Amino acid sequence: EDITSRVELGPRFRLPVPSHQVDRGTLENHMLKLSREKGNTVLLGSKVSNVEILPDSLHEISFIKDSEEQKVNCKWVADASGRASILKRKFQFQKPMEHHSNAVWWRLKGVIDVDDWTDKKDWQSYLEPGLRYLSTVHFMDTGYWLWVIPLGSKNTSIGIVADPAVHPFETYNTYEKAVEWMKVNEPL
């Protein structure tokens, strides 16, 4: 089996509105730089342990940095804790979901262009030249989907989203395991 036997969905021609994928790491570094230029203090390598939202005064954030608990006060709080979901858990904003999934992702240096995965000219010419490279490509099968996203930084984002009832998280929860998982499930 090669890539040309897979189902392909998406536009055959470029869309009238130009767009591109944002490299999240590049964006985050840029935002960090802008924040520091505005005089904000950014504490990398810290872990928030508690947030107190105080309606009539500055909010209080407790965090651990270098094994020491510290506190700061601030006017605004934005939860960027990822899966820890500090504010969502504290204020019980979570809602039960019927669909459960886990995800892993990473970036590879360099460009992955799925057009290069076959020499079949009829498949390559089915879409406007370069269109697959400008797209988020998803490979789907029972209980999972895998993405390949070319980034403006000339790197590629790869990710796996899977139902734990079909693909236990422990089988792909590290880079090394994810590569082995792909060899079994997506040998293309």
Ranges and model annotations:
Residues 34-187:
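Predominantly flavin-linked oxidoreductase catalytic cores and closely associated redox partners
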Residues 1-47:
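Conserved N-terminal/central alpha/beta ligand/cofactor-binding core
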